Each structure stands twice: as structure tokens, then as C-alpha cells.
Amino acid sequence: FPILNKEYTGLRNKLDWIKEMQANAALTVHHNIEEYSEYTGIPFHRIMWSANQKVFKDYGEGYTSDLFFSGVTRPEQTENLRERVLSEMSRLSDYKLEINARSHRNNYAGTIYSDEDYAKKLASSKICFITTGPSDLVGTRYFEVMSGNKSLILCNRMNEVVYGDMLIDGYNCVMFSTVDEFFDKAEYYLNNEEERMKIVNTAHTVFKDRLTWLNRSKEIKSIIEGYRE
């Protein structure tokens, strides 16, 4: 049961390797499981990340920033959406922002947080700006924010194929399609605390109920056991 990883680089070689080993099945966090299955002739199953609840939690401290972003910007990623949003952050000049962006513009310089420091950043920010990664991968940050139960996920809008039932706009996150919509929604939820926290709390409940590492391990176990029957 090989696990396909970093699907955005050397994908064809990785799929060929899985095809040659004639595995019973393969696992991946990417949503293109039908395409991978068709190419290799091997069943692919989608699994997913989670978060360490002992680290990504409510630390019992107040908020120190209104909006937080930490990550790399890549021109080829989601039509350079991160860079396009970050370049207009002056539109939120009345709010306290904490931005740790690394890109080709600054030779990818920036702070690399420890897990605990990073978790505390999430727990002290009212909104966390997140987008899908290379090849539209759903990364760990979505689950880390939900686990923390303090910050609102403000993320790029993707279809159900990508997000599945893990992320639902207006329910456990807030989605945007354009730069203008990002800023409209950021301001709205920074000025409507009750509505912001309603979504934050729902996200935490969803996480605890079905997105923890225990849930993930049970899902993987079930997949493997299905091939032993």
C-alpha cells in the first residue's frame, strides 16, 4: 500500500513506480484518484492530513493579531492568488496583521516557526489566510486551525472534488474567489465577532468529530482491511 506524496513534482515517475510494483492499492491525499487509478491500473484511495491536538489548541491567551499569514508564494500556484492578495494588504491598514511571506522577491527569506510557536500564532489570530497548495493540495494548515478553535479559516474557493465534505463555505470556513471578495469577507468577520466565532466553533466540532488523527488512522485501517477480506 504505497503512499503517493508531493504529487506536484515527478508525478509520472512516482506513478510508474507504483504501477511496476503491482501494489494491491495506493493511498494519496490528492483528489485525482480516478486519474491515478486509470493510469496505473491500481486502485487509489484518498486519505487526508489532520493535526496534533496537543500542540494545535487554545492556549488560553488573547488575540494579538487580526489576520495571520505564513507561507510561500509561488506564481504558478492558484494563479498567484497569495501574492495578489498580499500585495494589497494595505486595504486592511486599520487592522493588526502578521504576515510572514516567503517568495522569490525576498529570496524565500522569512521566519521558520517551531511547531509550538506556529500553533500559538494561529491561536492568537482572529483570521488565518490559507490557500490550497501546489496542484490544489489541501494542506495541514486547515486542520491545524480547526484544531486550535481560535482562528477563522479564510481560504480560496474550490469545488467539492478538492475540498470534499471537509470544508464548507459559511459553515466551518469562509471562502473567496477574488481579491476583492477576500478583503470584503476579512473586514466583515473582523467586525462581526459572534458570526466569526460561530464558524470557528463549528469547525472545531467538525474536526473533533471526524477529522482527527484517530479518525484518519481508522479510515486507513479500513481501506487496508478491505483488501484482506
What feature does the model see in each segment?
Residues P2-F143, S147, S151-D165, W213-L214, ...:
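Nucleotide-sugar donor-binding catalytic core of glycosyltransferases
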Residues V145, C173, A203:
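Hydrophobic, well-ordered secondary-structure elements that form the walls
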Residues D169-G170:
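Glycine-centered loop/turn motifs
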Residues C173-V179, Y188-E193:
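Conserved acidic donor-binding segment of nucleotide-sugar-dependent glycosyltransferases
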Residues F182:
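Catalytic phosphate/metal-binding cores of nucleic-acid and nucleotide-processing enzymes, i.e., regions
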Residues L190-I224:
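A charged, aromatic-enriched C-terminal amphipathic alpha-helix characteristic of glycosyltransferases
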